[in-house]
A protein has these predicted regions:
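Juxtamembrane helix-loop junctions of ABC transporter transmembrane domains
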Residues: 20-21, 28-41, 62-109, 113, ...
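Transmembrane helix-loop-helix hairpins at lipid-water interfaces of multipass membrane proteins
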Residues: 9, 15-72, 76, 149-154, ...
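Alpha-helical transmembrane segments of multipass membrane proteins
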Residues: 25, 29, 62, 66-70, ...
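Transmembrane helix-loop junction
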Residues: 38, 42, 149, 175, ...
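Hydrophobic alpha-helical transmembrane segments of ABC transporter permease domains
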Residues: 20, 28, 32, 57, ...
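An intracellular "coupling" helix at the cytosolic face of ABC transporter transmembrane type-1 domains
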Residues: 10-13, 76, 98-102, 118-127, ...
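Helix-loop-helix
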Residues: 48, 52, 147-161, 231-305, ...
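A short amphipathic helical element positioned immediately N-terminal to and/or at the very start
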Residues: 1-12, 111-112, 116
């Protein structure tokens, strides 16, 4: 993947724009729970209607800026990733024109088609998702923990424990998924190769009455691919309930122990709401970040396959 990074150089300005608006988006996302806590503690509890209205208007402004920043990040990220894919495809096409027959045969027509289409698309999608979901994750996590710590040091431990359990679950599941993603790319190549052979040799197949045999051959490759894809989806299906269980246990713990601290006069009600929001936000962005990182090994395998073409020295 590192060898393809130089294709991002023409988009340095767009990358800076994305970083600026991503920072604004994360700041707004984290500031809203703080305003919610202030409304409850200083407005609802004290019955101060003016404070509620003023803070509510501030929340609307912050929400508007956050939404606008999110839209701009999405739009600029889409332009960046699509331009990145276009440049790689152009480089692969130019390189393919210089390859000898032997070089082309070594790669294979089916594999060349896959690398020029779906592989590059996957690389572009991984760049898009990285910008959208991974970039905000460390900012949200660090800032969220800092804000939670500023509210209550003891309650922050619950969020840290929830994060640890989630990361442990994601690590164990991710090890299995990385292997399956690599297998799936190889099986897609096989399926494309068999399909191309059937399409290009359709006259010969019909002449020798081999249609049934070729159908069975294609079915075997399709079933092989589908079994791997189903295995991946089964693992994702197991991961999400585990994540939701960990998150809900964290929320229940915050409400339970927070309620005890409120009754003892060590915390205000609004702070419980803020801590719950911080926990949800941190876990949400961690979940999205882990999903992308599980996707990246597949994109890395695609990048290696594209680099094989770009690194060939023509005979």
């Amino acid at each position: 993947m590192k060898k393809l990074i130089h294709f991002l150089k023409p988009y340095r300005v767009l990358i800076v724009v994305v970083l600026i608006f991503t920072f604004l988006q994360t700041l707004g996302t984290l500031y809203i729970p703080t305003l919610t806590a202030n409304i409850v503690n200083n407005g609802v509890v004290k019955g101060d209607i003016d404070y509620i209205v003023k803070t509510g208007l501030m929340m609307m402004i912050v929400a508007g800026i956050t939404a606008l920043s999110a839209v701009l990040v999405c739009k600029v990220s889409a332009n960046l990733s699509s331009g990145f894919c276009r440049d790689i495809r152009e480089a692969v096409f130019i390189k393919s024109q210089d390859l000898s027959i032997n070089d082309f045969n070594n790669i294979g027509t089916a594999s060349m088609i896959t690398r020029s289409t779906s592989d590059i698309t996957l690389i572009g999608q991984s760049v898009f998702m990285f910008i959208q979901l991974v970039l905000p994750a460390p900012i949200i996590t660090v800032s969220g923990l800092f804000l939670a710590y500023s509210i209550d040091k003891a309650m922050t431990i619950i969020i840290v424990v929830v994060m640890f359990l989630f990361m442990l679950s994601a690590f164990l599941v991710g090890k299995k998924l990385i292997k399956l993603f690599k297998m799936m790319q190889i099986k897609m190549d096989n399926m494309n190769r068999v399909l191309r052979e059937v399409v290009t040799g359709v006259r010969v197949i019909r002449a020798f009455n081999r249609s049934r045999f070729e159908k069975k051959r294609f079915d075997r490759t399709a079933i092989d691919y589908s079994e791997t894809a189903i295995s991946i989806n089964k693992i994702f299906a197991v991961l999400m309930p585990i994540v939701m269980l960990i998150m809900n246990l964290g929320i229940v713990s915050i409400i339970w122990f927070g309620g005890m601290r409120v009754s003892n006069g060590n915390m205000e009600i609004g702070h419980i709401m803020a801590l719950v929001e911080y926990c949800i936000l941190i876990l949400f962005y961690l979940i999205m970040g882990v999903m992308v990182f599980m996707y990246i090994p597949r994109a890395g395998a695609c990048a290696d396959r594209v680099n094989q073409i770009l690194d060939i020295e023509p005979e």
